[in-house]
């Protein structure tokens, strides 16, 4: 039966949907009462055997055998499943009977079928209409959220820039820290190199001086020391100003003199400073002192660089072991540097007191204190500068062994004239006089040699500061 056709036996009836007409014919068919039929009161219809209904009747009327689809169709037309109640409790169905009911689907009332309508999802137009105030409120909230999002984006960008700047600052600080660590390491290496070299700066010692009668010593004179030497030899040290082309060079001559006395068993160590003008050893000696006199050069510049030292070894044909060793110290024009204060102090001390007699112990001590103060001032000046010298460079500069020695054994010493004079004066002295002079001046000469080495080390340090 198609939708819109009238039921049989009901002429002039309103059109009924096809599903309802088929359902009515199915329930009214007496041949299918064992599968589907009316209830006892005629208000509902019951499906007695669900499996047979799905296999036999559904394909015959609805062209499918899906019981679930049939139940969905019933729900769309308003049919409800009847639940059995007993004493207000839902009772479990003992069989597979399913019962449905509808207010207009009753036995003997076929005319009520036209009142059964299929449910249509009606959309209310009122629900679609949105109030203008609500819409404005939603738009305002969206705008506020956008502003907050923009503010968050700006803050995030600022934080990124600050983070980048902080990382750059951290990198700079790390670089500075690394430079400070390197500088500190170099300073420590420099200090350790000084400690390994056994350098002594600013050590105050008491030095005793002995007057030499008949001589005109300079301000800072040195005494003679008689040191026993094997094979009857004597060593003579003299510092003089050689007569070169410009007359400005100064030198220290170390002479090894063979003792010609037959009974002499000890050598003589004599230190003599000669001036550059006459180049002759001062012969005026004290009766208690041996051989020669030590005198300071007229001018001594602490800022001048010290060139390599030449040691000349010359042997005479008639005398064995007669060696002359000369150490030349050239003067050069040093540029102005931070140690000008030290130079001025030393120049004042040297130029103002060249012709004075021998200084006493207190004046020598004051001079050494002045050198100590000058060294401390130099250290304070250099502490504010940064040097890139390694520990090896410092060790090479402050090496007390003077590695730049030039051993020239074929060159004749320019001070060979003093050797004959010193030999003659040695022959004139007696063994008793030499022993007496050696016992008196042994300790004093040792201290004088230590002070000379210390002063040369100071000169080396001042020359390094002018580089």
Curated annotation (Swiss-Prot):
This protein's UniProt keywords: Activator, Cytoplasm, DNA-binding, Nucleus, Phosphoprotein, Stress response, Transcription, Transcription regulation
Compartment(s): Cytoplasm; Nucleus
Region (Hydrophobic repeat HR-C): 364-389
GO cellular component: chromatin; cytoplasm; nucleus
Subunit structure: Homotrimer.
Functional summary from the UniProt entry: DNA-binding protein that specifically binds heat shock promoter elements (HSE) and activates transcription. HSF3 binds DNA constitutively only when the C-terminal region is deleted.
Protein name (record): Heat shock factor protein 3
Species this protein is from: Gallus gallus
Lineage: Eukaryota, Metazoa, Chordata, Craniata, Vertebrata
Encoding gene (name): HSF3
């Amino acid at each position: 039966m198609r939708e819109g056709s009238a039921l049989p036996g009901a002429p002039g009836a309103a059109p009924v949907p096809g599903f309802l007409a088929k359902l009515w014919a199915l329930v009214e068919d007496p041949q299918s009462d064992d599968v589907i039929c009316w209830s006892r009161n005629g208000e509902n219809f019951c499906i007695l055997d669900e499996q047979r209904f799905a296999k036999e009747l559904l394909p015959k009327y609805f062209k499918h055998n899906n019981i679930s689809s049939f139940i969905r169709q019933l729900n769309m037309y308003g049919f409800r499943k009847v639940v059995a109640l007993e004493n207000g409790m839902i009772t479990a169905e003992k069989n597979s009977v399913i019962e449905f009911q509808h207010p207009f689907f009753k036995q003997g009332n076929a005319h009520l079928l036209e009142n059964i309508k299929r449910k249509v999802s009606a959309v209310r137009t009122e629900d679609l209409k949105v109030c203008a105030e609500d819409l404005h409120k939603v738009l305002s909230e969206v705008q506020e959220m956008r502003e907050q999002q923009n503010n968050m984006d700006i803050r995030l960008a600022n934080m990124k820039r600050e983070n980048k700047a902080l990382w750059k600052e951290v990198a700079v600080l790390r670089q500075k820290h690394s430079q400070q660590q390197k500088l500190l390491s170099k300073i420590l290496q420099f200090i350790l190199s000084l400690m390994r070299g056994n350098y002594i700066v600013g050590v105050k010692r008491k030095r005793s001086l002995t007057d030499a009668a008949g001589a005109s010593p300079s301000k800072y004179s040195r005494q003679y020391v008689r040191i026993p030497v094997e094979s009857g030899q004597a060593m003579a040290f003299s510092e003089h100003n050689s007569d070169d082309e410009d007359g400005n060079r100064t030198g220290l001559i170390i002479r090894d003199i063979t003792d010609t006395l037959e009974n002499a068993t000890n050598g003589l160590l004599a230190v003599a400073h000669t001036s550059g003008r006459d180049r002759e050893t001062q012969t005026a000696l004290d009766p208690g002192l041996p051989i020669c006199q030590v005198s300071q050069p007229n001018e001594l510049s602490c800022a001048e660089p010290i060139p390599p030292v030449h040691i000349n070894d010359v042997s005479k044909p008639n005398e064995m072991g007669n060696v002359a060793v000369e150490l030349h110290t050239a003067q050069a024009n040093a540029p102005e540097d931070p140690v000008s204060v030290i130079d001025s102090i030393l120049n004042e001390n040297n130029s103002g007191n060249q012709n004075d007699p021998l200084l006493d112990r207190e004046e020598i001590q004051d001079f050494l204190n002045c050198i100590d103060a000058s060294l401390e001032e130099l250290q304070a000046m250099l502490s504010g500068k940064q040097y890139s010298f390694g520990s090896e460079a410092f060790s090479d500069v402050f090496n007390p062994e003077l590695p730049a020695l030039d051993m020239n054994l074929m060159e004749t010493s320019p001070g060979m004239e003093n050797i004959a004079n010193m030999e003659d004066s040695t022959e004139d002295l007696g063994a008793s006089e030499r022993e007496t002079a050696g016992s008196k001046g042994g300790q004093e000469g040792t201290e004088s040699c230590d002070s000379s080495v210390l002063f040369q080390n100071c000169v080396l340090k001042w020359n390094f500061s002018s580089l």
